[in-house]
UniProtKB/Swiss-Prot annotation:
Localization (cell): Secreted; Target cell membrane
Any one Gene Ontology cellular component term annotated for this protein: extracellular region
Species of the source: Naja sputatrix
Gene Ontology molecular-function annotations: toxin activity
Tagged with keyword Glycoprotein: no
Name of the protein in question: Cytotoxin 2c
Subunit structure: Monomer in solution; Homodimer and oligomer in the presence of negatively charged lipids forming a pore with a size ranging between 20 and 30 Angstroms.
Stretch forming the signal peptide: 1-21
Family to which the UniProt record says this protein belongs: Belongs to the three-finger toxin family. Short-chain subfamily. Type IA cytotoxin sub-subfamily.
Tissue distribution: Expressed by the venom gland.
Length: 81
């Protein structure tokens, strides 16, 4: 009985994420990275002239300011960028 209980506890620890970790897409959306602590936003950066082609994607802690040439889109759910 103790072995079964210990097994259930270990499976729970392995399967559950102890502390939420955000996952953001890298430049190629097939790949993603787990964001470090404090980085609670995913972002996508692209040039205003070519909005369909992202230049950079990743994790960030604050919403960056867009400019006339560069636009940022941020979100806070897994792989939303």
């Amino acid at each position: 009985m103790k072995t079964l209980l210990l097994t259930l506890v270990l499976v729970t620890i392995v399967c559950l994420d102890l502390g939420y970790t955000l996952k953001c897409n890298k430049l190629v959306p097939l790949f993603y990275k787990t964001c470090p602590a404090g980085k609670n936003l995913c972002y996508k950066m692209y040039m205003v002239a070519t909005p369909k082609v992202p230049v950079k994607r990743g994790c960030i802690d604050v919403y960056p300011k867009s400019s006339l040439l560069v636009k940022y889109v941020c979100c806070n759910t897994d792989r939303c960028n």
